Amino acid sequence: MSDHVRPSWGGDPSIAWRILLSSVPRQLLSAETVAEHQRVLHETQGWPAPPPVVTGEAAAVLREVAEVRDVPLVLGVSGAQLVVSAFHAYVDGLGLLEILAALTGQPVTSSARGVGDRRADGGGAVDRLREVALAPPASVALPTIIAAEGDAFAALSVEGRVLTTDLVHAAVAAIVDRNTSRGRPSDHVAIAVGAGRPATPGERLANRSELIRLRDLELLSLSEIETALRAAPLDTAGGSGAAGGRLARYAQKALASRLGSTLLVSHLGEVTTTAASVPTFYPVTAGGTGLSLGAVGHDGTTVLTLRGRAAQWDGSSLGALLTQVAERLT
């Protein structure tokens, strides 16, 4: 019998708030095997019975599992590829790695250290409203596409280890260059950096994520971004979607595109595992521009992703922007 209690969640209801991790397990897993492992995981977590495993062509599976509402966990299988889709109210990015470990029966660990005892920004809500009125965050020049439903995705691999600071710096440079080439301003580039608090042994899965938010990054050098990232407080203005976020309670629908950030960046760190290869992480597309940049390192390679709303971006345009980010890492 499930002791499931749905977590409180105040996130933008226009999106599904699902975080995704795809990988290629070392041992080929059938949909039936994955379903059985998921059933056991749901029982362990006290979650309701899981939905059926989604199967089909890889891109279609990714799109489908990204749009399921409220269900804690949805899994997809396409050939050798396994896709984990979790509702962010129940699971954070590091939790996706725990799920992969449970499904494969092999340990999956990350170098990510979390936010530690970093202080919170007590003036977050007031400061964010002032920002909306006086200096809203920069947008990203949109492509001309045929609008579609749901989200669009792009991924590519780069050699070596990529640090979060380097990724933020490269993303800012790519956005500024894109906007400049299209005659758009890039004043007040704001990056929300996702972070987490690693679980202690025996803890159930939960959303332990936090946000660190940096502004006016178009004015900062790489070393200055590194310093700012180390010193910045935790963002308390409700950007994570948790029900306790003050802005989420009264301004989210009217001001979502201005309350958010130019880009969300979330790095799962260097992952160590023999369970699977090519781990690929897609953070949520919430607030601001609706663009999120994900990263995860494994076996000397870092997979970068971009995710955006298909009403504004398609895979090709996201891929072009992601290539610009990757080029600025070298």
Regions found by a protein language model. Name each.
Residues 1-124, 155, 161-213, 276-330:
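Non-catalytic N-terminal regions of enzymes
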Residues 114-161:
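Internal metal/ion-chelating core segments
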Residues 204-271:
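Helical lid/core segments from catalytic subdomains that handle acyl or acyl-like groups
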